[in-house]
């Protein structure tokens, strides 16, 4: 699956699934613009990609801040990048009982996991419409399909991202723009590493394949949706979860 001549935005590209996605899209031939709050690691990922003779840039991005999203879009314009692919990978969550949540917690979860993809997509979609072509791939979660204990608001946000994907796909299909969603199961990322060991063990036990996903396995699905191999696929959600949601 080649992306030669394409330009891709990858949010959350400094680590985990986002990093794997940026590396994979660049390897496939795309010019990648990485956005992340972590400027040190984000710039390092872009530099490592360039060191392999591939094209990558980095610009700071807080998907939960509309001003930051606007500045990120301006950075893309300053680089004269005509974005063909938006990969909404940035996410945040914390296992916590719903009755222990605060309104501030709700807002952060919703702003990063739902409104972040909405804002970034809204910023780059006009160019895709103008060129009558584009791909939007949003990383949701199987929590958004079947729920997850201790992740009630997170599950709601991720479920919203799935619904956003389906509705937007209907709206922009006339412009030859594909909009799809990838739902990872528990994945070996820095975010999951912060989860207590007992919860990680429970995730593995609940997964028929009895292991965590590798970030590259999620990136594989993102690459498919971003490529011409998925030219007639839109509004779809695929779980990459080792069978965790067989009935989902």
What does each model-identified segment do?
Residues 2-33:
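Canonical Rossmann dinucleotide-binding motif of NAD(H)/NADP(H)-dependent dehydrogenases/reductases
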Residues 2-4, 145-146, 223, 234-248:
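Short C-terminal tail/terminal secondary-structure segment
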């Amino acid at each position: 699956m080649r992306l030669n001549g394409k330009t891709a935005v990858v949010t959350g590209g400094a680590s985990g699934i986002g990093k794997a996605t940026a590396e994979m899209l660049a390897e496939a031939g795309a010019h990648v613009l990485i956005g992340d709050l972590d400027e040190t690691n984000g710039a390092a990922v872009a530099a490592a990609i360039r060191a392999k003779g591939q094209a990558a840039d980095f610009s700071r991005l807080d998907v939960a801040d509309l001003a930051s999203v606007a500045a990120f879009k301006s950075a893309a314009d300053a680089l004269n990048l005509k974005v063909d692919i938006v990969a909404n990978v940035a996410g945040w969550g914390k296992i916590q009982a719903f009755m222990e949540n605060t309104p501030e917690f709700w807002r952060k979860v919703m702003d990063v996991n739902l409104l972040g993809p909405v804002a970034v997509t809204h910023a780059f979609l006009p160019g895709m419409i103008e060129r009558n072509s584009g791909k939007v791939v949003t990383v949701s979660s199987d929590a958004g399909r079947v729920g997850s204990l201790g992740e009630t608001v997170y599950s709601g946000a991720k479920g919203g991202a799935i619904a956003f994907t389906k509705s937007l796909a209907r709206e922009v299909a006339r412009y030859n723009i594909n909009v799809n969603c990838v739902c990872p199961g528990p994945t070996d990322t820095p975010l999951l590493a912060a989860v207590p060991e007992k919860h990680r063990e429970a995730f593995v036990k609940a997964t028929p394949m009895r292991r965590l996903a590798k970030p590259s396995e999620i990136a594989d699905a993102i690459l498919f949706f971003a490529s011409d191999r998925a030219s007639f696929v839109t509004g779809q959600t695929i779980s990459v979860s080792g069978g965790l949601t067989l009935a989902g």
